[in-house]
């Protein structure tokens, strides 16, 4: 676990009107919370997209022909990078606004809390966390709960199991 401040560079782009979407400062706060104590320096990009772009990316990269809530694209460390050279690029997150809004409504969650959860979830994927089996999912979900609790956000998995 690392201590001290995180040097964070988060590029945020909106591919649809910003009305009703979280501000860039919120996304940065959620990313910083997910990285706190885990990494000291990070560069990443977040793109908030519509359903058409979300579906296109999910189809192209995952072979699934529907829009999903969040996609994580971890950066590859360049081959031949000298040992000891820092490579702070974490990767990219794509968050599909209509899917997030629909899920928040269906699950009775506050919209901003759901965005926070999915941002944290996506950042953890960029850090190498996964949920391919029950044990991995349980560990990742517990970490998400802890991070979100630090942000004052309720357990997003309450009542699911």
Curated annotation (Swiss-Prot):
InterPro entries: MetalPrtase_cat_dom_sf_prd, YbeY, YbeY_CS
Superkingdom classification of source: Bacteria
UniProt keyword Ribosomal protein present: no
Subcellular location: Cytoplasm
Principal place of residence: cytoplasm
Keyword tRNA processing in annotation: no
Pfam family for this entry, one: YbeY
One Gene Ontology cellular component: cytoplasm
Top EC category: hydrolase
Enzyme Commission number, as recorded: 3.1.-.-
Cofactor: Zn(2+)
Entry similarity comment: Belongs to the endoribonuclease YbeY family.
Its job: Single strand-specific metallo-endoribonuclease involved in late-stage 70S ribosome quality control and in maturation of the 3' terminus of the 16S rRNA.
PANTHER family reported for this sequence: ENDORIBONUCLEASE YBEY, CHLOROPLASTIC
Protein name: Endoribonuclease YbeY
Lineage: Bacteria, Pseudomonadati, Pseudomonadota, Gammaproteobacteria, Lysobacterales
């Amino acid at each position: 676990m690392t201590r001290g401040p995180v040097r964070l560079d988060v590029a945020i782009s909106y591919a649809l009107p910003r009305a009703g979407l979280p501000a860039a400062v919120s996304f940065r706060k959620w990313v910083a919370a997910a990285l706190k104590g885990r990494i000291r320096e990070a560069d990443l990009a977040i793109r908030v997209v519509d359903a058409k772009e979300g579906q296109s990316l999910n189809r192209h990269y995952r072979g699934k022909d529907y829009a999903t809530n969040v996609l994580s694209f971890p950066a590859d460390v360049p081959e031949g990078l000298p040992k000891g050279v820092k490579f702070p690029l974490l990767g990219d997150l794509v968050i599909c606004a209509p899917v997030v809004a629909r899920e928040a409504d269906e699950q009775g969650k506050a919209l901003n809390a759901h965005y926070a959860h999915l941002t944290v979830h996506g950042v953890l994927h960029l850090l190498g966390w996964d949920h391919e089996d029950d044990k991995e999912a349980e560990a990742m979900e517990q970490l998400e709960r802890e991070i979100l609790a630090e942000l004052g956000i309720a357990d997003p998995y309450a009542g699911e199991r």
